[in-house]
């Protein structure tokens, strides 16, 4: 089932998500829906808070990205970055901040402890695009958006777009969470 995506300024995107205690049929269904929603929106990563669930769960599939065709889709539950190496600056975008892109510096490689879709504990080394997407999605689990990590001068350049999103002006080809926009009353 395709789920609507929460958009910039939705409160759930600023909450620290709660750890999962296990995987049941409801979580399995959520995982399948998250993959379907992510692919429908032409995304390569999606965190549960983006679809209205404040839990520490993310999915990613970078196989559509050039030079990443060999990468398999991943389910990451309760992630914890154990170590980081190097850093690089790359342009990012986000399904929750549609139409906005900006450069973000992130570690180039990470060692990650997490649980998979079967809730089996794993530790893995990730680099390149996979490391970047994992870090971007973990930020969602911690209530951080990529625009928060942009240089101040670069963020000023996108302020108009962020203001439009915050006021409910959203143009996407995928479903987003509808919200009531309350107009500011003009003085009489």
Swiss-Prot record:
**What are the BP-aspect GO terms?**
co-translational protein modification; translation
Q: Catalyses which reaction?
A: N-terminal N-formyl-L-methionyl-[peptide] + H2O = N-terminal L-methionyl-[peptide] + formate
Catalytic activity, EC: 3.5.1.88
Record: active site = 137
Which Gene3D superfamilies does the protein's record reference? Peptide deformylase
Disulphide connectivity of cysteines: none
Cofactor(s) recorded in Swiss-Prot or TrEMBL: Fe(2+)
Q: Which UniProt keywords apply?
A: Hydrolase, Iron, Metal-binding, Protein biosynthesis
Which molecular function GO terms apply here? metal ion binding; peptide deformylase activity
Q: What is this protein called?
A: Peptide deformylase
- Specify which residues bind Fe cation according to the UniProt entry for this protein: 94, 136, 140
> Its family?
Belongs to the polypeptide deformylase family.
């Amino acid at each position: 089932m395709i789920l609507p995506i929460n958009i910039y300024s939705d409160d759930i995107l600023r909450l620290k998500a709660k750890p999962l205690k296990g995987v049941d049929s409801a979580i399995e269904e959520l995982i399948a829906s998250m993959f379907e929603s992510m692919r429908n929106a032409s995304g390569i990563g999606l965190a549960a808070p983006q679809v209205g669930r404040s839990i520490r769960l993310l999915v990613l599939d970078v196989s559509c990205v050039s030079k990443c065709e060999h990468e398999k889709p991943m389910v990451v539950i309760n992630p914890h970055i154990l170590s980081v190496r190097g850093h690089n600056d790359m342009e990012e975008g986000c399904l929750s901040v549609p139409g906005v892109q900006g450069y973000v510096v992130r570690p180039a490689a990470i060692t990650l402890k997490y649980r998979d879709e079967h809730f089996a504990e794993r530790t893995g080394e990730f680099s390149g695009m996979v490391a970047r997407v994992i870090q971007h999605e973990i930020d969602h689990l911690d209530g951080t958006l990529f625009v928060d990590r942009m240089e101040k001068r670069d963020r000023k350049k996108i302020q108009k777009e962020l203001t439009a999103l915050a006021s409910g002006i959203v143009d996407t080809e995928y479903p987003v969470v509808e919200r009531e926009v309350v107009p500011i009353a003009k003085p009489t």
